[in-house]
Amino acid sequence: MAASKKAVLGPLVGAVDQGTSSTRFLVFNSKTAELLSHHQVEIKQEFPREGWVEQDPKEILHSVYECIEKTCEKLGQLNIDISNIKAIGVSNQRETTVVWDKITGEPLYNAVVWLDLRTQSTVESLSKRIPGNNNFVKSKTGLPLSTYFSAVKLRWLLDNVRKVQKAVEEKRALFGTIDSWLIWSLTGGVNGGVHCTDVTNASRTMLFNIHSLEWDKQLCEFFGIPMEILPNVRSSSEIYGLMKISHSVKAGALEGVPISGCLGDQSAALVGQMCFQIGQAKNTYGTGCFLLCNTGHKCVFSDHGLLTTVAYKLGRDKPVYYALEGSVAIAGAVIRWLRDNLGIIKTSEEIEKLAKEVGTSYGCYFVPAFSGLYAPYWEPSARGIICGLTQFTNKCHIAFAALEAVCFQTREILDAMNRDCGIPLSHLQVDGGMTSNKILMQLQADILYIPVVKPSMPETTALGAAMAAGAAEGVGVWSLEPEDLSAVTMERFEPQINAEESEIRYSTWKKAVMKSMGWVTTQSPESGDPSIFCSLPLGFFIVSSMVMLIGARYISGIP
């Protein structure tokens, strides 16, 4: 029997989408933007201490190999010729920090994840040394001094991990965010791997000047970071190197394919949603929640707690675009917490069913500040709370409150963005794994009181990376000209409650947020000076109140 003929679908482009919770490899038709096949692997997170979040860089890399291999197998089963994959793009969780040995190729410590809080004391120490004025870091980077960004994570590694210190002394250390680690490994690693990053990822390190688009010497000196360990900064769309995978790895089918696109995941989603015009915005619902608004070639600095960041630069000679961003630490992660920590649900999909059973939180409010509060508060002392509980409250109400929390946090960011831009959004474009939850999308429309618009193909983060890779000079299989971009079908969610009810729910949520603040400090419990014991008036009041209560009961003869 003659072998079946492989299908020819026009040039194909692959995309590695490496997120906090999972890794995926997806393949698109560059002429239609159709998703042809993909594979996903969940990634473990480690929590060695309270507030610490780590991942194994080698597990992340092997998950990429596995996803490439399995996706290629699936394409073969569909009779699609994988030799037609002309380029590969990378999108990645931002800020997560890796340091590795360029001689051995081994990571020198686990990846310190963007959610990690161990650097709060480092941040407080650095804030006391800011030269000149408190705007020193933000004016150059668009970012507040926070545990969120890579510079303080790298500073912690240099201060606390002897292997990292030794490798830096011996000129063997390389630093990078996840994109750098993957591109270096996929282009050969110790055998000529390319050590680079793109402008969007560099802009999240707190070491990168978003005006000059270069590593900033003053910032590196302030944080005490040796510049020789930093990756070369490139545009988001150019050929960085060719796939060069070890023969021991089955994913070698794509050997020699150029890696030609790289964007931090939120910038990739902005591109994938085709938000190329000033004022266009998207919100991605993943582990966290990230609302970006394209501000064009101009850096717009927020007065309301938002970040200024690089949106994209789609080619070496192309202009840079900036964005205002609101970041929420915990969105999809709250669903994972309900599943893994509380056991309220067995699968993430169950939460929609539970929420649908009651259709209300019944006055229960959930502030999932597990890693403090990000935009617009930037309050690391906050911690998660569930309040408004009664004897009537059950797991369905808590599930509903968890979904509402994601929507309320988005509302806070959108309000801040409207104040900064002066032009309220008429609708919100959304993407990310959580958008498959129809109750969440309807809640979001109700709480924002504007329509929520969701593309029928939700993989916009990977699509953005694929578009950047396919459009790169020397590849040229994907046109980004407006007239050539494929039309995307959309699902639209209209508000179904009145504006007054929306405002009442939102104002009650704001009260709950205030109650979540001020729960922790960086003061060591070993210092012998914890605040609860320092308050003599409070202690005296509690003891004397108890004495009076006991005395009153005794006098009145109450048993």
Curated annotation (Swiss-Prot):
Kinase that plays a key role in glycerol metabolism, catalyzing its phosphorylation to produce sn-glycerol 3-phosphate. Sn-glycerol 3-phosphate is a crucial intermediate in various metabolic pathways, such as the synthesis of glycerolipids and triglycerides, glycogenesis, glycolysis and gluconeogenesis. Sn-glycerol 3-phosphate binds at residues 20, 94-95, 148, 265. It is linked to Glycerol kinase deficiency: A metabolic disorder manifesting as 3 clinically distinct forms: infantile, juvenile, and adult. The infantile form is the most severe and is associated with severe developmental delay and adrenal insufficiency. Patients with the adult form have no symptoms and are often detected fortuitously. GKD results in hyperglycerolemia, a condition characterized by the accumulation of glycerol in the blood and urine. It comes from Homo sapiens (Human). GO terms for molecular function: ATP binding; glycerol kinase activity; metal ion binding. This is Glycerol kinase. CDD domains: ASKHA_NBD_FGGY_GK1-3-like. ADP binds at residues 20, 24, 287, 332, 433, 437. The gene is GK.
